[in-house]
């Protein structure tokens, strides 16, 4: 039962990532229809192929074994999807870009500045998201072990690198030479 809840949370996060690409662009009923179709036709098959030792795993009769196989039929290079890197981030990212291209620009795009209007709530949301990703990545090791610690540290290092890049980008954009 716990694993079902864990997997449903991953599906909810994947659809939430796509929702950021279509804010102010589609009606809610249309969005719910899209989510149902996307989870059924894209997310669930991809989860089965990557996380269940099927088509895209390290099993001997998969695509990775045929493309990068050794003489004994095992995959020499197999995808490692820790905490949903390909299933969640890649599939929802590509789907979000495709959806944004199909739907078109936002109505308010380039008409008014898109600044955060409630900075404490923005920071609270960022902190909650940070805690959630640390939990997802650490929890994907299914135990308090070295793998969970490495996942936690990698998540922290990636967040710090992103923050430094954001600060550098804001400094480059907002200052004049």
Question: How would you describe each model-predicted region?
Answer:
Residues 1-177:
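Hydrophobic alpha-helical transmembrane bundles of multi-pass membrane proteins
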């Amino acid at each position: 039962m716990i694993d079902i809840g864990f997997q449903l949370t991953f599906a909810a996060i994947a659809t939430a990532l796509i929702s950021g690409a279509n804010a102010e662009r589609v009606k809610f009923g249309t969005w719910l229809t899209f989510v149902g179709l996307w989870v059924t036709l894209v997310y669930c098959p991809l989860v089965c192929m990557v996380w269940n030792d099927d088509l895209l795993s390290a099993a001997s009769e998969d695509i990775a074994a045929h493309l990068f196989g050794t003489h004994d039929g095992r995959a020499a290079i197999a995808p490692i999807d820790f905490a949903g890197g390909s299933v969640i981030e890649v599939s929802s990212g590509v789907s979000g870009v495709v959806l944004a291209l199909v739907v078109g620009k936002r109505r308010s795009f380039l008409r008014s500045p898109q600044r955060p209007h409630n900075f404490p709530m923005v920071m609270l949301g960022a902190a909650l998201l940070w805690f959630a990703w640390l939990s997802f990545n650490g929890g994907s090791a299914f135990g308090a072990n070295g793998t969970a610690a490495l996942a936690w540290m990698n998540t922290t290092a990636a967040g710090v690198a992103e923050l430094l890049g954001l600060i550098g980008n804001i400094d480059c954009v907002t200052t004049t030479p």
